[in-house]
Amino acid sequence: MKKWLFTSESVTEGHPDKIADQVSDAILDAMLEQDPESRVAVETLVATGVAVVAGEVTTKAYVDIPRIVRDTILEIGYTRAKFGFDGETCAVLTSIDEQSPDIALGVNKSLEAKNDGKDKYDIIGAGDQGMMFGYATNETEEMMPLPIVLAHNLARRLATVRKERIVEGFRPDGKTQVTVLYEDGKPIGVKTIVVSTQHDPAMTQEEIEQLVKEHVIKAVVPEEMMLDGIETFVNPTGRFVKGGPAADTGLTGRKIIVDTYGGWIPHGGGAFSGKDPTKVDRSAHYMARYVAKNIVAAGLADRVTLQIAYAIGVAHPVSFMIDAHGTEKVALEKLEKVVKEVFDFRPAAIIDKLNLRRPIYKQVAAYGHFGRIDVEVPWEKLDAVDELKRAFNM
């Protein structure tokens, strides 16, 4: 029997980096709502008393960026200066240029299209080079690794008890971390839980610990999942009053492991938020998850990792890899062949298949882009299962 521990973390919507992600995606959604063809690459920085939005945009839409920034920050819960940040009074600075014409050359007309390609999906070239990964497993209902599922659920619950005033005195910033014991590739139980929550200065450490255990941890982690001798750390520094952008500068794209699989598989390095779907950093990651999830749901493997790579301005991927980690129920060579036949990984085909030119991104800018069962997103659908099964006469 092989045993090991694996740990993943999540953060609340009030974490500075997540504020930035949500602002960037709120701006993207507003532009896509008016102009689905918008080209958007928007980065956000939040710091003490200020939010800065910069990037490259080509769109027919008119968007009141400062208002979107403020509304997003207020919705998260930064509504009073004593919380360290106030969406109504913070300064908002913007610096927006149009998309580089050199990049647009390759995105507007791919290398294949320039070489007289007549296929409609050859028109759009990848918006950048890079490699993207997708993963799915049958170990949880979400088809995600258990550590990241629990970490997200704890972070989301932390926000819920604050927003619904189940607990008084919690503030928006917070982090969670979960360590799970695995045995022969299967999760056995939870070994360690870490929860840190920003709080009112009048609250005592003992009070915070009791409230977190009662209203957050018990509500998320079933008792039978907790191993004997489980360690629980609540605000282990002993104080977390100063939080949010007043304590740490937040930037778009700094929580890419939280956004994906909690470190379970490799990551190509590209962030999601603030990017329209011509950016394969976003769309190809979503497609890789969609394909992996359908493979596992079809019973072709217990868990699977995909890697796709692109060259800027070229529609077809330059490489494709599939690894079932020894859990495949069919020949791996045939599985790769079938996947390439059933799914089209060119950017225009991905955008069309998943209907990505819509304002659907802010809702996944916190608590993970994958394994979401609380919102409906196209890359989590299981509508390719039957086609995959037919290919293997199942």
Curated annotation (Swiss-Prot):
Region named Flexible loop: 99-109
PROSITE patterns per UniProt: ADOMET_SYNTHASE_1, ADOMET_SYNTHASE_2
Any one Pfam family match given in the protein's UniProt record, by short name: S-AdoMet_synt_M
Chief site of localization: cytoplasm
EC code(s) of this entry: 2.5.1.6
InterPro entries: ADOMET_SYNTHASE_CS, S-AdoMet_synt_C, S-AdoMet_synt_central, S-AdoMet_synt_N, S-AdoMet_synthetase, S-AdoMet_synthetase_sfam
GO molecular function, one term: methionine adenosyltransferase activity
UniProtKB keywords: ATP-binding, Cytoplasm, Magnesium, Metal-binding, Nucleotide-binding, One-carbon metabolism, Potassium, Transferase
GO biological process: one-carbon metabolic process; S-adenosylmethionine biosynthetic process
Binding-site list for Mg(2+): 17
Record localization: Cytoplasm
Binding positions (ATP): 15, 173-175, 239-240, 248, 254-255, 271, 275
Keyword Membrane tagged: no
Binding site for K(+): 43
Swiss-Prot/TrEMBL catalytic activity: L-methionine + ATP + H2O = S-adenosyl-L-methionine + phosphate + diphosphate
Enzyme's top EC category: transferase
Family: Belongs to the AdoMet synthase family.
Subunit annotation: Homotetramer; dimer of dimers.
Protein name: S-adenosylmethionine synthase
Organism of derivation: Kosmotoga olearia (strain ATCC BAA-1733 / DSM 21960 / TBF 19.5.1)
